[in-house]
UniProtKB/Swiss-Prot annotation:
Orotidine 5'-phosphate binds at K288, K322, D325, S385, Q444, Q445, Y446, G464, R465. It comes from Naegleria gruberi. GO terms for molecular function: orotate phosphoribosyltransferase activity; orotidine-5'-phosphate decarboxylase activity. This is Uridine 5'-monophosphate synthase. The gene is UMP. The keyword Glycosyltransferase applies. The active site is at K322. The keyword Transferase applies. Pathway: Pyrimidine metabolism; UMP biosynthesis via de novo pathway; UMP from orotate: step 1/2; Pyrimidine metabolism; UMP biosynthesis via de novo pathway; UMP from orotate: step 2/2.
């Protein structure tokens, strides 16, 4: 069977779709041997003769492309036991000499660990594997073969879960001074792309799978399945990941000022709001306002005073407007009307109920129409801190989708936990932070700074009544600043 006459990409596509059809590739929630819960599961033991022959074509194609067919004195060996059918099919189809490696030496018969014909210290052995996760079984088999005098440097694998680093299209496994090159035929990135293109998978499903892969990796030097913990980046490092000017500004401000505290000024007096801003300004990275709840009508003089306090104490202004109407209306609410939010507020937020993409487009247009050039950002409301909130999984997924489509303007999310571990370019801002109580009579639920920052991996703690109801507001702000920043320091050092 000549691979040169076969469309390899078409064959890959056919195999992916067939794997789904027969149930060899499943999506859902599966607990692996390591204890990790995976969004997909692969079982190639159920494939039939036709697919086995097609697998052999792909494996031999990679073997040829990588120059392994040019090796002198070579044999192949399937990693016991699931890959033995692969190596047997390749051996018969392409006339390749084959050996069999046992998992353990038998105490009867020949007692050989390796069965087959080879010359010690001369014969090269190419390993064949079905699926690779950590690479432990490949290294273990290679060591057994080497102990019997075979030379092992390379392995072919049908599918990689991509939980090992890929270098020039291959995995590099190390054990001591030994190095093994693993050449995959197919990656989960390719698999999910085929399923997306064929309408068998949504973009959100694909992103969840790729996120899982990115956050559940294994060290290339390990031979046991020990997941690598993702390095927690500093705010300074995360500022380099984004082209969003507001996000850059806030990340850098938090690091320089050493505060991730936002005070929620949910009060009804202009004078009291300005007083609170002046009292707590030295301790905060942002001041959150509700301009439409003030009893005395705010005017341009008031917003100018607020901007001057922000400049004096080096904090940013966040208007908690929760825009939710159709595009044309939110344009007016944001840039015009009695409040002219875009003129003085660095950051605003929005629900997704009227269509997140349309809302973002309208807000960006309003900035352009009003000729506002200062950095402006938007937080999408993905999760809320009130009991019974209807912001469920679909809201979260829509928020992620809109944010990824508009990274220049969407700075992050209002949320109760970090939405995706691999999206460090976004800000995760959490209301409902308080130390002394767990909730109120209207359904608000509170969490501690350490829980929000360390456990839930959020960035900005938003504190309202815990500060503005305190008789010593400045001291309360100092305390929350200290606790929030200590939690951040603890997180990045873990």
């Amino acid at each position: 069977m000549e691979t040169t006459t076969i469309d390899i990409q078409a064959l890959k596509k056919e195999l992916v779709l067939d794997l789904i059809q027969i149930g060899a590739l499943k999506f859902g929630r599966f607990t692996l041997k390591s204890g990790i819960v995976s969004p997909f599961y692969v079982d190639l033991r159920i494939i039939g003769p036709k697919m086995l022959r097609q697998f052999s074509v792909l494996l031999y194609h990679v073997m040829t492309v990588k120059g392994l067919t040019n090796m002198e004195k070579r044999v192949i060996c399937g990693v016991p036991y699931s890959a033995l059918t692969f190596s047997s099919c390749m051996s018969m189809t392409y006339d390749l000499p084959m050996v069999i490696c046992r998992k353990e030496r038998k105490q009867y018969g020949t007692g050989n660990m390796v069965e087959g014909i080879y010359t010690k210290n001369e014969t090269n052995c190419i390993l064949i594997e079905d699926v690779i996760t950590s690479g432990a079984s490949i290294v273990e088999t290679a060591e057994k073969l080497e102990n019997e005098g075979l030379l092992v440097t390379d392995a072919l694998v049908f599918l990689t879960r991509e939980q090992l680093p890929l270098t020039n299209g291959m995995h590099i496994l190390k054990k001591g001074e030994k190095v093994y090159n693993v050449h995959p035929c197919l990656t989960m990135t390719e698999v999910t792309q085929v399923l997306l293109d064929e309408g068998k998978m949504s973009q959100e499903q694909r992103e969840d799978i790729l996120q899982f892969i990115g956050t559940n990796t294994f060290s290339e030097t390990k031979t046991t399945a020990v997941p690598q913990k993702k390095k927690e980046l500093t705010f300074t490092e995360r500022a380099e990941l984004t082209n969003n000017e507001f996000s850059k500004k806030l990340f850098k401000l938090m690091e320089e000022k050493q505060t991730n505290l936002c005070v929620a000024a949910d009060i009804t007096s202009k004078d009291d709001l300005l007083k609170l801003a002046d009292e707590t300004g030295p301790e905060i990275c942002m001041l959150k306002t509700h301009i439409d709840t003030l009893d005395d009508q705010p005017d341009e003089q008031f917003t100018q005073q607020l901007k001057e306090l922000a400049k004096k104490h080096n904090f940013l202004i966040f208007e908690d407007r929760k825009l939710a109407d159709i595009g044309q209306v939110v344009k007016q609410q944001y840039a015009r009307g009695p409040f002219k939010i875009a003129q003085w507020s660095d950051l605003c937020n929005s629900h997704l109920v009227s269509g997140g993409s349309a809302t973002v487009k309208a807000l960006k247009e309003s900035l352009k129409e009003e000729n506002i050039t200062e950095p402006r950002g938007l937080l999408l409301i993905a999760q809320m801190s009130t009991e019974g909130a209807t912001t469920g999984e679909s809201t979260k997924q829509e928020a992620l989708k809109v944010a990824l489509e508009n990274p220049d303007f969407v700075s992050g999310f209002i949320c109760q936990s970090k939405l995706r571990d691999d999206l460090d370019q976004f800000l995760y801002c959490t209301p409902g932070v308080r130390l002394d109580v767990k909730g109120d009579s209207l359904g608000q639920q509170y969490n501690s700074p350490e829980y929000v920052v360390c456990e839930k991996k959020c960035d900005v703690i938003i504190v309202g009544r815990g500060i503005y109801h305190d008789k010593e507001r400045q001291n309360a702000a100092k305390l929350y600043r200290k606790l929030g920043w200590e939690a951040y320091q603890k997180r990045i050092q873990q």
